[in-house]
């Protein structure tokens, strides 16, 4: 099964029989290095906290249990032993502890499983989201008989409140959806669009030079037309089972009653005080009285509750017109020192686009995700396609040779990404040629040898277009959020959602939500040094290229693994590594979220500090790589479907949990 977009031959939304699929063994066996059980992943309880095993599913989930167990789990404080903030192009969102108080028995059980490094197991449904409040909201919907589409609405509404720096109503999202009744995969593009008044020189100064990055980010210039509210509505109208208005109740209650500020949110606010204080409304919320939000303090957002009530009553049209739309436009145009050009007409014209998935074959599975304007599925598909003929399973995680192959295949794929990939509604692209078997075999031949490739260049895939595109060097920031859901009917979704940079444009509307800075995902330049036009340049109405890679891995036409992560352009490496861990190295779904990261996009190998990845620095350097050991904070969330069971895993680097029944 191969399904693509653009100029690829396509089967449209491929038909599969409904139900779940067994994926073979996912336990670490005698032939596989027992990395997880030896604890080399680096996630350990704090000294003196003990090592409480996960609660048995059969144990009654009582309020008393939660009351006494949760404080113990919170002492485990999900801060990896290596947590640090090394220099980077832009500092990633940091690893942090979980919520400081509150939580249900289901959250207590989820935290216990996470602390023990074990998946959460369920029979009927599963949700994995980036914050316990959001996961609980999704779980309540599913428990009440709601579908994955219903859960999506509830989860996103809560994420915009408790994790406002990462996603929200003012941003965009990509969704991969499996329809169990029809046995079909499809994807939805809720990416932000450039305003109609945007010009290719939007991020250039009067001399035609690119602006400094953060000068472009902070303010109205970087704000694209949000897509998330319309995406929520489109998916609910198609697959929702519960009334739309009731799906916002949890988020409204939290916004009005307040919630404790998590260590992660508090830490990120403290690191960005000056940016957040740039605009009064944002500063008043995140830095009240000149003091950054304190961990554990109760934060309320009645304005956001009001916005949600309006959406609950009147639907997404109330966001894209009327008072909310006018407030968005006024906020963008009123950004002192850096106003933008977003107009009411842009909001009124916004549409979500349904697109066929991009799928590539790997280890007898089909790895399916978003096509352009996302580069995620294509770049990951190219990398995995180049590795098909390599026995990574025998080499294992601890092999420098395995990482040489993965790293250089990724570099070759990123070279193609930077030259060719953009919004195919605006730019012609060799989509079919990039993942053609003969082209991938040609690129894979470059991996022969035992040393790092000295340099990589974009290839020349088959293409019926003569245009030569320029090389892009746009920067995609390591923020964003992700969640995964499987419901009782077998519908599955993988959704990556974002406002781009942490806290986006730093502009907060009167409606209590932040606006994105998504337009800075475009190239700031229009042409490269050779004079070739850059595919990912700014154009009116265009969607900026993304690395977001929500993924559903299929086996025999049925979902086997639902996975995704935040992380900027490292998203691609994080997700493909999780898939390799699952399919090649026999790791379970929790282990693949905790696996140490090694990522190579542009020649330098980024190795995750304080983990087994750092042990590979010397052998990789001996192969000719430049190596940097640094904090790499993914937020992987995954659900495996094995023999009729659902297994959920949540990245211990962040606050997410898996809840299922």
Regions found by a protein language model. Give the residues of each.
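Active-site rim segments in enzyme catalytic domains, especially the processed small/beta chain
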Residues: 161-168, 172-187, 338-343, 491-557, ...
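Extended C-terminal subregions enriched in glycine
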Residues: 541-543, 575, 584-631
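Short, low-complexity intrinsically disordered segments enriched in small and basic residues
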Residues: 11-15, 19-21, 37-53, 58
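Short, small/polar residue-rich loop motifs at catalytic or cofactor-binding pockets
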Residues: 354, 477-480, 546-548
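Internal maturation/activation junctions in enzymes
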Residues: 104-105, 389-499, 508, 519, ...
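Noncatalytic scaffold domains of N-terminal-nucleophile
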Residues: 85-136, 140, 148-314, 319-321, ...
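Bacterial N-terminal signal peptides
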Residues: 71-80
């Amino acid at each position: 099964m191969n399904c693509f977009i653009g100029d690829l031959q396509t089967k449209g939304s491929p038909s599969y029989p409904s139900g779940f699929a067994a994926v073979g063994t996912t336990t670490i066996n005698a032939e596989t290095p027992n990395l997880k059980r030896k604890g080399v992943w680096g996630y350990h309880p704090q000294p003196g906290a003990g090592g409480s095993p996960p609660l048995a599913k059969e144990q009654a989930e009582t309020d008393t249990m939660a009351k006494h167990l949760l404080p113990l789990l919170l002492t485990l404080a999900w801060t990896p032993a290596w947590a640090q903030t090394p220099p980077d192009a832009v500092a990633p969102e940091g690893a942090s502890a979980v919520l400081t108080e509150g939580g249900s028995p289901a959250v207590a059980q989820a935290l216990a499983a996470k602390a023990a490094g074990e998946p959460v197991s369920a029979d009927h449904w599963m949700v994995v989201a980036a914050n316990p409040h959001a996961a609980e909201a999704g779980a309540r919907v599913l428990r009440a008989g709601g579908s994955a589409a219903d859960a999506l609405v509830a989860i996103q509404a809560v994420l915009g409140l408790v994790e406002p720096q990462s996603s929200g109503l003012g941003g965009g999202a990509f969704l991969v959806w499996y329809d169990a009744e029809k046995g079909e995969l499809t994807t939805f593009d809720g990416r932000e669009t450039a305003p109609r008044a945007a010009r290719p020189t939007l991020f250039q100064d009067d001399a035609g030079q690119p602006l400094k990055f953060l000068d472009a980010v902070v303010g109205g210039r970087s704000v694209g037309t949000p897509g998330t509210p319309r995406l929520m509505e489109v998916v609910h109208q198609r697959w929702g089972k519960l009334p739309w208005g009731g799906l916002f109740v949890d988020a409204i209650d939290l916004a009005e009653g307040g919630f404790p500020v998590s260590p992660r949110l508090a830490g990120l606010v403290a690191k960005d005080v000056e940016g957040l204080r740039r605009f009064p409304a944002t500063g008043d919320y995140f830095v009240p009285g000149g003091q950054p939000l304190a961990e554990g303090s109760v934060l309320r957002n009645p304005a956001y509750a009001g916005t949600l009530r309006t959406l609950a009553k009147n639907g997404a049209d109330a966001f894209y017109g009327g008072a909310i739309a006018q407030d968005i436009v006024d906020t963008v145009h009123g950004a002192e020192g850096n106003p933008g050009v977003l107009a009411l007409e842009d909001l009124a014209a916004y549409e979500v686009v349904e697109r066929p998935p991009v799928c590539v074959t790997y280890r007898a599975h089909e790895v399916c995700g978003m096509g352009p304007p996302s580069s995620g599925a294509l770049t990951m598909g190219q990398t995995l396609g180049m590795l098909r003929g390599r026995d990574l399973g025998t080499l294992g995680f601890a092999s420098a040779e395995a990482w040489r192959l993965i790293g250089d295949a990724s570099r070759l794929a990123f070279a193609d990404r930077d030259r060719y990939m953009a919004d195919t509604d605006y730019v012609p692209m060799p989509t079919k040629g990039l993942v053609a078997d003969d082209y991938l075999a040609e690129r894979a031949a470059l991996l022969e040898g035992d040393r790092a490739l000295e340099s990589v260049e974009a290839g020349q895939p088959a293409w019926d277009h003569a245009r030569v595109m320029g090389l892009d060097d746009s920067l995609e920031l390591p923020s964003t959020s992700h969640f995964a859901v499987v419901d009782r009917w077998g519908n599955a979704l993988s959704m990556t959602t974002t406002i781009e940079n942490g806290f986006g444009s730093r502009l907060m509307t009167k409606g209590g939500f932040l606006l994105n800075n998504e337009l800075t995902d475009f190239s700031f330049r229009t042409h490269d040094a050779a004079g070739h036009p850059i595919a990912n340049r700014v154009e009116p109405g265009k969607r900026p290229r993304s690395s977001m890679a929500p993924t559903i891995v299929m086996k025999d036409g049925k979902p086997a693994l639902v996975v995704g992560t935040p992380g900027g352009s490292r998203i691609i490496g994080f997700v493909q590594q999780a898939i390799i861990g699952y399919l090649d190295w026999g790791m379970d779904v929790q282990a693949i979220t905790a696996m140490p990261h090694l990522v190579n996009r542009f020649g330098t190998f980024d190795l995750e500090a304080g983990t087994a990845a750092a042990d590979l620095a010397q052998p990789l350097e001996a192969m000719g790589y430049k190596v940097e050991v640094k904090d790499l904070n993914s937020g992987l969330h995954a659900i495996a479907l094995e023999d009729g069971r659902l297994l959920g895993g949540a990245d211990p680097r962040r606050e997410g949990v898996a809840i299922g029944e």
